[in-house]
């Protein structure tokens, strides 16, 4: 029997709460597997003349990225990332051998149904993911600038997976005095 009573502190339960949160996040992510989305990371800095945005979009072709202004001070960057894999040389050799065998009529996987021949291809080398850390699916980021910007002179470039934008600030309107005649 203990002489001192131990009172649990909120920090004692932190690992348990983290575990429950991870489980909840995992379950909710599986339910929405049909439409995956993510927000790419951006660095935003301001100079005297412009705003500079640099975002990580690795492996996304330029044709899958849309940049537009939704209002005078709001810029939206959106697009789609797809998972693509290139088969290894062994896979290419197997595919070429299968194609050559089928061309010569040596396919061992032909089933005759009446007068029709139905050839069944081997199931493609289906892979099972052990870890899936790449961001795949739709993405969108919205940036609202605190000052007016010159939409006509925005410059964007995509190099080595980094999308760089230069959004020049608009020249502040000057007061114009009108003389009365």
From Swiss-Prot:
Protein name: 30 kDa heat shock protein
Gene3D superfamilies: 2.60.40.790
UniProt similarity note: Belongs to the small heat shock protein (HSP20) family.
Region (Disordered): 79-127
Biological process according to GO: cellular response to farnesol; cellular response to heat
Keywords in alphabetical order: Stress response
Coiled-coil region list: none
Taxon lineage: Eukaryota, Fungi, Dikarya, Ascomycota, Pezizomycotina
Species of origin: Emericella nidulans (strain FGSC A4 / ATCC 38163 / CBS 112.46 / NRRL 194 / M139) (Aspergillus nidulans)
Regions of compositional bias (Basic and acidic residues) in chain numbering: 79-115
Pfam families, per database record: HSP20
Superkingdom as given in the UniProt entry: Eukaryota
Domain sHSP per the UniProt entry, residue ranges: 33-181
